[in-house]
Amino acid sequence: GKDDLRERLKEITGQKESYDVLYDPVGADLFEPALRSIRWNGRALVIGFAGGDDKIPRVPMNLPLLKGCAIVGVFWGSFRVRESKEELANFQQLFEWFNNGDIDPLVSDVYPLEEAAVALRKLMNRQAVGKIVLTTE
């Protein structure tokens, strides 16, 4: 639950205010307690609402004021169109990190292209954990 998250973050980091950046692609009930654990001048990146439209969090507006933090919407589709040079540079950096082994994305499932419908159904039912990869081999 909400209190468990804050306690777990304190346990992991040894600090009440645990991190500078909150990356949240899910939304839902844990956004507010996660925001309460952000450091002064932190940034909360709202990536999406994988938790579903009915789980879009509501945040007391005094919370960003008290934390001195920014809540930033990150919409990749618009960023890609409006800032294409930066988007290309970001992808080049990500692939460099990947090729060097600096990042290791979680791949939960691999399907042949012929089973794309199965993979898509898993995504639509919110059953995917990590990435799903389709292969052509």
Label for each model-derived stretch:
Residues 1-30, 86:
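Adenosine-nucleotide cofactor-binding segment
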Residues 3, 32, 62, 114-117:
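Residues in well-ordered alpha-helical elements
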Residues 3-7, 79-82, 112-113:
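A short acidic, often aromatic-flanked loop/helix-cap motif at beta-alpha or helix-coil junctions
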Residues 8-12, 93, 97, 122:
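Solvent-exposed, charged/polar functional surfaces in cytosolic regulatory/catalytic domains
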Residues 16, 95, 102-110, 117-137:
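C-terminal capping/lid region of NAD(P)-dependent oxidoreductase domains
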Residues 20-23, 45-46, 105-108:
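Short catalytic-loop micro-motif centered on adjacent basic/acidic residues
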Residues 29-102, 135-137:
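Glycine-rich phosphate-binding loop and adjacent beta-alpha segment
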